[in-house]
């Protein structure tokens, strides 16, 4: 019998959209597959992805990842015309798509990409149903974060 491959230590995360958590209240998260071409998978294995400006576009009953940049490798993309900014189809269940359409159309939410990661041999994208933050919400988040840091510093020095 063959042994199971041991999981290599390290992160399975390829890219994160930290700005999305700063600019939006994330109400609900979904995990979606991505429809990719061969050169895109190779560039993702090399970690050449950026989802900072990406969002999810809903049209014709399907969801698409728009604005994500996958930088092509020169070795892997010599015989193919590569478009690093192409729109990629998201693979979701019908129930999940209906939920997304309902919240975006009726309640005024938007859908943003939060992170890109490996799950076994598949590339997955975590998307979030989000509502935009106001400026004062961002300031309160920053104040809360700074207070947590100050609190941990005080506790560290108090224990000495």
From Swiss-Prot:
Assigned GO CC terms? cytosol
Stored Gene3D superfamilies:
2.40.280.10
Extract one GO molecular function annotation from the record: RNA binding
Taken from the record, one Pfam family name reads: SmpB
The record's annotation in InterPro entries points to: SmpB, SsrA-bd_prot, SsrA-bd_prot_CS
Q: Identify the CDD domains for this entry.
A: SmpB (cd09294)
The keyword Phosphoprotein belongs to this UniProt entry's keyword annotation: no
Q: For this chain's UniProt record, which GO biological process terms are given?
A: trans-translation
User: Principal localization?
Assistant: cytoplasm
Localization? Cytoplasm
Q: Does the keyword Glycoprotein apply?
A: no
Q: Which HAMAP family match?
A: SmpB (MF_00023)
Please name the NCBIfam families in this protein's record.
PRK05422.1, smpB
Q: What does this protein do?
A: Required for rescue of stalled ribosomes mediated by trans-translation. Binds to transfer-messenger RNA (tmRNA), required for stable association of tmRNA with ribosomes. tmRNA and SmpB together mimic tRNA shape, replacing the anticodon stem-loop with SmpB. tmRNA is encoded by the ssrA gene; the 2 termini fold to resemble tRNA(Ala) and it encodes a 'tag peptide', a short internal open reading frame. During trans-translation Ala-aminoacylated tmRNA acts like a tRNA, entering the A-site of stalled ribosomes, displacing the stalled mRNA.
Q: What is this protein called?
A: SsrA-binding protein
Q: Which organism is the protein's source?
A: Sodalis glossinidius (strain morsitans)
């Amino acid at each position: 019998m063959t042994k199971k491959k041991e999981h290599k230590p390290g992160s399975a995360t390829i890219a994160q959209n930290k700005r999305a958590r700063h600019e939006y209240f994330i109400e609900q998260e979904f995990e979606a597959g991505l429809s990719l071409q061969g050169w895109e998978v190779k560039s993702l294995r090399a970690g050449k992805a950026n989802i900072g400006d990406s969002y999810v576009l809903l049209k014709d009953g399907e969801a698409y990842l728009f604005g994500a940049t996958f930088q092509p490798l020169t070795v892997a993309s010599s015989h193919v015309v590569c478009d690093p900014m192409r729109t990629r189809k998201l693979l979701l269940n019908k129930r999940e798509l209906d939920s997304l359409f309902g919240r975006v159309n009726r309640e005024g939410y938007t859908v943003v990409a939060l992170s890109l990661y490996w799950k076994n041999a598949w590339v997955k994208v975590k998307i979030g149903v989000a509502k935009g933050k106001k400026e004062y919400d961002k300031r309160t988040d920053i104040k809360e974060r700074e207070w947590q840091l100050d609190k941990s510093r005080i506790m560290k020095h108090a224990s000495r």
